[in-house]
Amino acid sequence: MVCDLALGLVRRGHQVAIHCVDGSEVPGVDLITVPPPRDAAQALVMPRGRPAPQAPGVAAAIAGMFDAIRSSRPDVVSQHAFDAPAFDQARGLAALHTLHLPPLVPAVVAAAASTPAAQLATVSASMLRAWRAAGVDVGRVLRNGVEDVDVPDGAPEHLALVAGRISPEKGIEDALTAARLAGLPARVAGAVYDPAYDVDLQGAERLGELTRLELRRVMARSAVTICAVRWDEPFGLVAAEAQMAGCPVAAYDRGAAPEVVEDGVSGFLAIPDDTDSLAAAIERCLTLDRGEVRASARRRLSLAGAVDGYESALMEIASS
């Protein structure tokens, strides 16, 4: 999402630099890099998991990034790191902090609470409510968006797709169970995010990690994409990408799913944690007009719309 936003702003004539780790590649955008910290993996936030341990290497990398940012004297900073040091390092800068996750980490909640509301955004109305309930006055919602790319025409295969990172909160077991109940073979696409997570994918075709274009093409050929997440997901890019490929989505009705899936038009929502309800949603998805699915996504989930929102917010902060 960060790369897409940067490219979108560059195409509108803005000068943009991405501060990131060595090895990153974003053609068309200037990159200012730091070495990847050795403890980056242990700093990952795991929903429903144990709190992430201290990661001094990550804090040092963030400090190095912000040293470079300050020396470049930018008009405004779009900050997407979900780490308390990132908020601290940005003090005094014209910065917009996007909260891509719920208020899971006490240190991040405290850092966000001490940041002016006008400098805070989150990605859905669901997350806005969650952060405000945690005592953080978030000033705006800036929804994610996905690029509209050409996808193959033709009838989809009689297959269900489960896509995203391989981790407990994604509910892969429920998705596969519901697919079986609906009589659909399943494919699973995604990289392992939580090495400790041992999931049984027996009976499903394992596609592994795909490029974004490869995944979009698989979505275009799939009868339905199943999103059986077990937590209040902040947005749901997989669901958005599937709809943009014309693939309807069957999802649990929780988190931002009602904002991302247009129930009855681009997919169907199911009772959370109820695989029978999810199977029924899958079956109903097979009756939807895939052209209408894609049209719905273009209206609501476009990358251009997301860039519009960020451009307006960043210019407002830069001029304040």
Task: Describe these PLM feature segments.
Residues M1-S320:
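Catalytic cores of nucleotide-sugar-dependent glycosyltransferases that transfer UDP/GDP/TDP-activated
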